[in-house]
Amino acid sequence: IQSHFIANSTYFKAIEHETLFMYMLHLREPIMDAIELLTGNRVNMGWNVVGGVRMDAEEKHLNSIYQIIKNLEEEYDKYVEMFEEGPLLALRSKDVGKMSKKDAIKGRAVGPIGRGSGLKHDVREEHHTYKDEFDWKVIWRKEGDNYARTMNRFDEITESIKIIKQVIENIPPGDVRKKITIPAGYADWRNEAPRGEVAYMAETNGNLIQNISIRTPSIMNIDVCGKYMLQDVATVADAVATYASVDPCVACTERVIILNEKGEKKEFDGLHTVKYLQ
């Protein structure tokens, strides 16, 4: 929720709609408070650990979070309506930065970027917890433009509100973390992050991690923006807005750091340069 709010606020800033820009940040702030209430942090939460989560959630905190979500639900729709029915917003967003479903598949677009171009795919569908225990649906739109990507995030916020309420109402008792032994070998996992599918690939010797690679959604989404969305934009202003609609995390595209047994480090960045660090 907080990620989609800041993504849409950035888009509204790019199309010079200061009012909705500020409203998005206004709606996001209580969500940040809820995150801090649960985890102790607002950005780098450090909540998930191997085998579960770091600590249990107190009932009073869950009640407070439920109320925050309920308050958001009550005032949320009027701001979405401002975007849906605003003629100037439509002028800056509809038929701008278009990407077809075919191009989205070819470029491997993920998350709201792919779903905004007609790809009905969400990694959460593949996880039995989401699929079997929660009432939710995959949000997608077929237009493939800046408007579709922004509305896709708005609609996904609505689904996230539904999921959070169900989690709080049905959270089971028991341990919050399993005691596990990590075997030697290789494993991979995919999850649905706010910007789309994120993949983890790790190799261990049974004690230490020897190799880990993380493929973030911005790698594919920034790529399809340049290849397809920006090809037919009419103005520089539309190009800026289209780039913002992708919700790019440039830092996420930094690729890998390799440590060898001698302690030497090679750092490969997004420009494919290599630095040897002492």
Predicted feature locations:
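Active-site bordering "gate/hinge" segments
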Residues: 1-278
